[in-house]
Amino acid sequence: MAPSLFTGCSTPAPRTAGSDRLELSFKPYDLKLKHAFNLAKNSRTHTPDVQVQLRYGDYIGYGEASMPPYLGETQESVCRFLEQLDLSQFTDPFRLEEILDYIDSVAPDNRAAKASVDIALHDLLGKIMGQPWYRIWGLSPEKAPATSFTIGIDTEEVVRQKLKEAAPYRILKIKMGLDNDKELVRIIRSETDRPICVDANQGWSSKEYALEMIEWLKEQNCLFVEQPMPKEMVDEQAWLHERASLPLIADEFLQRLPDVRRAYGLYDGINIKLMKSTGMHEAYQMAILARALDMKVMVGCMTETSCAVSAAAQLSPLVDWADLDGNLLIANDLFDGMKIVDGKISLPDRPGIGVVPL
C-alpha cells in the first residue's frame, strides 16, 4: 500500500533495544461505488472507510473498518476510538485473547473500529506463522461455496446492466423492501433463471405481506430470505418463522456472539459480517455456535476493499452460503486478495488474510 495513505494518523509505539511492540496506524479512505447502492431505507454513492496497519518488527498486518450508514459509525468515530488504543503495551502479538479483550474494553459498540484491528492482528499473526487463516482453522479451501452477486433496488436499465456484470456468478442476491419488489424479480427472470436469494433489509413491516412475498419468492427459485422484517418485531418474526416455507436468515437482528442464541428459534440461520461481529475472532466463534445449534451459516460483507472481504473469506469453507462481493462493487480497491472463479470463492495460498497492496 502506498505509504502516503498512512501519513499523519497513527498511534506510534516506543521501540526499545531488542524488543518489538505492536504499532498501529490508520487513515480515512472513501470507497467509490461503481453504481449507486439502493436499499429499502437509503441510497449512497460511496462508503466511508478507515484503513489500518499493524506493525510488529518487520511484519505488517492490514485491516479496515467499513461504515455503511446503518452501523452508526463514522470515520471520525473510528479514528477517535483507534486513537485511544495503546497497543504498545503488548510485546507478544500471539496473546490474541488478551489483546482483543483489551480493545473491546476501551469503549462499548464501535464494532467496525474493533474489527479493523482484529483483522490486522489476524493478518499479522498469519504472516508470522506463514499460513493463511483457513489453514490455521483447519478448513479446506475446496469447500468454499459459490458467492452471490448483489443487485440493489434500481431502474430497469441499471438492473439489466448489473445482470451483465453478474454473468460469471451462479447465485444472485436481490435487495428488496419497496413496493416494486415483484417487478424487480420479473425483470431478473426475463434475463436469467439462476437461483436468487433475497435481502429485504427489514423492509416488510406486515407479517402477512412478508409471508405472501416469501411464498411467491419460493416459486421464483429463491433459496432464502434475509431479515424480512424489522429486527425489533420479534413476535411477528416468530409468527413468520413458524409459517414460512423458505429459510429465514438473521442479518440486522444479529451483531455479536450472544445474538446467535437469541436468533435461535426465530430464524433458520445467521449472516455473519466482520464489521458487526468485531472481526474474525468472534465471527469464527459465531459460526461454530450456529453449527452446534443446527442453524445455517452465511458469511457476508459490507462494501469493502479486498482486505476485509478476503478476511471474511477465510471463514467461507465453514459456511453454507457466501455473499462476498463487496470489493467488486467499488471502483478504487487497494488490495489484491480472494478471487471469484466460475462464481466460486478461490482462496489465495498467501499467509494471513491473503492480501497484498496494489
Please place each PLM-identified region on the residue numbering.
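N-terminal export signals
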Residues: 1-14
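Metal- or metallocofactor-binding catalytic centers and their adjacent structured scaffolds
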Residues: 19-26, 42, 54-56, 60-128
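Flexible C-terminal active-site loop/helix
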Residues: 20, 24-33, 49, 57, ...
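Short Pro/Gly-enriched beta-strand edge/turn motifs at strand-loop
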Residues: 30-38, 219
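Conserved, mostly hydrophobic/aromatic
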Residues: 52, 58, 117, 130, ...
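Hydrophobic faces of well-ordered beta-strands that scaffold small-molecule active sites
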Residues: 61-63, 145-151, 170-174, 196-200, ...
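Metal-dependent enolase-superfamily TIM-barrel catalytic cores that perform enediolate-based chemistry
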Residues: 133-244
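Catalytic alpha/beta core domains of metabolic enzymes, predominantly
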Residues: 232-324
